């Protein structure tokens, strides 16, 4: 959206909806590792994965939609999750579903990551079309953007930079005291 406001070269971003459901912790031992399906043309396929909290997360679907705010779940989407997950994991306990949700991924029509300075908008760095394995690629994408900015702005390393910080406290693991 922002790219198209500043550049004459237009990107065509398609909202790709992914629906999920989350099972109660009582279902958490149904699988011990992430179970991946074979990926399709729209994404990585439906997976079943234990969460750090002991639940099971199942999804996503992948459907290109028009509505850029369309984060509703649908009966057909949730049924598709169950059917596809059931091909790899038997007897998923649907009675233990505690919530369902959907999110949108920004699919770019060119089917590739776009990480570059917009040619006709100096200083505007695009990071678009980042899909699977986008999460895994995030550190490399960050380094690419840093390199673009370093070269453009002639940045120098700060020898006094402190790259470590204290860890984030998890209140659930703390004692009452």
Language-model regions: role of each:
Residues 1-42, 67-68, 72-79:
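Predominantly flavin-linked oxidoreductase catalytic cores and closely associated redox partners
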Residues 39, 43-45, 49-53, 64-177:
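C-terminal catalytic lobe of FAD-dependent flavoproteins
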Residues 61:
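Residues forming anionic-ligand binding surfaces in small-molecule and nucleic-acid pockets
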């Amino acid at each position: 959206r922002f790219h198209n406001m500043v550049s004459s070269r237009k990107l065509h971003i398609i909202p790709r909806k992914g629906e999920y459901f989350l099972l109660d912790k009582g279902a958490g031992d149904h699988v011990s590792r992430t179970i991946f399906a074979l990926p399709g043309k729209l994404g990585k396929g439906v997976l079943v994965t234990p969460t750090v909290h002991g639940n099971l997360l199942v999804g996503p679907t992948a459907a290109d939609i028009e509505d850029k705010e369309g984060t509703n779940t649908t009966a057909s989407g949730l049924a598709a999750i169950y059917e596809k997950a059931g091909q790899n994991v038997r007897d998923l306990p649907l009675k233990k579903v505690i919530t369902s949700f959907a999110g949108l991924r920004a699919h770019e029509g060119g089917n590739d990551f776009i990480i570059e300075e917009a040619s006709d908008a100096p200083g505007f760095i695009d990071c678009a079309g980042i899909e699977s394995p986008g999460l895994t690629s995030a550190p490399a994408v960050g380094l690419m953007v840093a390199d673009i900015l370093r070269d453009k702005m002639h940045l120098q390393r700060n020898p006094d930079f402190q790259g470590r910080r204290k860890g984030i406290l998890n209140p659930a693991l703390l004692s009452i005291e």
